[in-house]
Swiss-Prot record:
SUPFAM superfamilies: ALDH-like. It is an enzyme of class 1 (oxidoreductase). This is Gamma-glutamyl phosphate reductase. Residues 1-27 are annotated as: Disordered.
Amino acid sequence: MSVEAQSRSGAVDTQEPADLREQVHSAARRARVAARTLATLSAEAKNRALHAAADSVLANVDAVLAANAADVDAARQGGTPEAMIDRLALNPQRVDGIAAGLRQVAALPDPVGEVLRGKTLPNGLQLRQQRVPLGVVGMVYEGRPNVTVDAFGLTLKSGNAALLRGSSSAARSNQALVDALRSALAEEGLPLDAVQLLPSQDRASVTHLIQARGLVDVVIPRGGAGLIDAVVRDAQVPTIETGVGNCHVYVHSSADIDMAEKILLNAKTRRPSVCNAAETLLVDRALTDTALPRLVKALQDAGVTVHADPTEDELRAEFLSMDIALAVVDGLDAAIDHINTYGTGHTEAIVTTDLAAAQRFTERVDAAAVMVNASTSFTDGEQFGFGAEIGISTQKLHARGPMGLPELTSTKWIVWGDGQIRPA
């Protein structure tokens, strides 16, 4: 299907109206109208649209890759680090994966309408609590074009409209993808404003999005610490923090060192630029003369720079690169204290053969996910068996951990009566 027609473009008009705030708010109002339709769509209709969107992305792969090549070229000329280039870059295999992700979302259960609990009161009133869409979901994210499609798929399946504000570094890629998605919506007779792309060249568009009270129901920032902190600090609409991951691997005195080495290397080197990568290695002081040299050598042999005398900033850093901070701790409780001081509430891991130590660690470490003898890289919606995710929440309200379809819903109480009135 063609995405030539400008009428199908999801970009907010940057010429008229001239006021950027009004542009963003106008997009949000259109999204609210679209959300009313999406909230009542059948699962079958949503699934057809998701398959159509996957087909459209594949049909327009040449346009998507050409747009992405221009983004990557501009990023390289601007001196963007290779770790960030890797996040930005698309290739035919990655586009295939993006389309496959939409089909995977189509295969997931529809959360809308799910009854969570119910009861009949003594007066005969019948109560049930069921899932309903959030409404208009704003996404603010950095240079990862796949997030554009992931966000569309998850918001559509959960009955929400999406307002997307991606990075200017991925502007061409995001536009090509949104054009393909909106083409599929048009083919299915669904509101094009189910997904809209906000201007990315002016940072003020973020401010207008996150302060659109009454128009936007929630904003989800996905990116580095600076982006997330700025959105949470300045927002006037509800936000869900995602992603910043200063994840630790603690090697307990009882650890199987072969296992510890394997877990550590996987957690650090599998994909160092993602939020569930290990950023700090904690080693029990009892292992200083035995396991520690071996673990450091294994990291260095894998190309990791080990910060053996880390600064305060390095202990708090989300490197997103082949770097890791190293700290020696005086036992289990010291490791727990260190993690609760420097961690970001994402994912923490212990390697141990001591069941009591493992239980104490899981009970006392404050994080969305706590691993025992497993890599931090498993904190992922697909790995957890939830399907795709819109991010990993590091806060405690409304959601925590990998955010899939259920986390993109709220609840509504439905009460059936037969003329009951409340006594005075």
